[in-house]
Amino acid sequence: MKFLLVAINAKYIHSNLGIYSLKAYAEKELRKKKKAALAGTGKLLSGVAEAGVQGAEWASDGAVVTETQSVAGMSSGQVQVEIAEYTINHQMDQILQDIYRRKPDVIGFSCYIWNIQYIRPFLKDIPKVLPDVKIWMGGPEVYYRAESFLKEEPTVTGVMVGEGEATLAELAEVYGEAEDIDIRLEQVRGIVFRKTSGGILHTPVRPLLPMDEIPFSYNNLEGMEHRIIYYESSRGCPYSCSYCLSSIDKTVRFRSLDLVMKELDYFLERKVPQVKFVD
């Protein structure tokens, strides 16, 4: 199961902090699920040994798997999250070809004022070449009008509303299991999605994450040598500018100062030429 997070930036030197943050958090949660599943397998092995269970099957790596064992937790390790960044100066055919080559099962588009009109044609073209792909949208250009956007774009499966880190991690788990997807999507907070029956469902608002729970987005700087790195030490805004979406929610959260200093040191040690705060 492959998730492809797509950003279409205004310039090559720009990067999309949002999708890097989503990827980092999703991978952290998937590792936790896999670790918990492996721990559960260890307990199962211990129980099998103590009880002398007959008829157990041995997997290729030597682990015992019984017919009744649930492998739900193990499948999280099979979910792959990739990032694809393009610019509005790319030819649309180039982008479509690259997305097709990556063969994603689920695509997530990061939508802003500078790319939403550029993205819309892909919502019609991608299903023509990848008919089974699920398309999800996120970002300020879609989540405040999620239901109307779904009505305008019938190929889109759903919209992530608000901050997407925890939401994407849960979506990855749902699609990784590939069972009772509609029922399980109803349990994912912070989405508006199109049910298989055609109806549109809003799930409850997702609580905001503490900033320190969001992992550092740049543990790998490969490919970032000539690009601007964006960094946030806080989210939210206390002001009420009428033209700005940030004024809708006046909640302000901060990353701990020690963590901010540690992460900025990481950039300095690697001689990153430019870091921009997006607070």
State each model region's role.
Residues 2-11:
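Nucleotide-activated donor-dependent transferases that construct or modify glycoconjugates
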Residues 10, 142, 248:
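Short, glycine/serine-rich, charged loops/turns that create anion-binding
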Residues 12-19:
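Short N-terminal binding/cap micro-motifs at the start of the first secondary-structure element
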Residues 18, 25-27, 43, 47, ...:
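Glycine-rich beta-alpha loop elements in corrinoid/cobalamin-binding modules
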Residues 23, 120-123, 229, 264:
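Generic structural signal for well-ordered alpha-helices
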Residues 25-35:
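A short, Lys/Arg-enriched amphipathic alpha-helix followed by its capping loop at the start of a domain
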Residues 52, 205-211:
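A short, sequence-level motif marking secondary-structure junctions
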Residues 60, 212-279:
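Radical SAM [4Fe-4S] cluster-binding motif and immediate context
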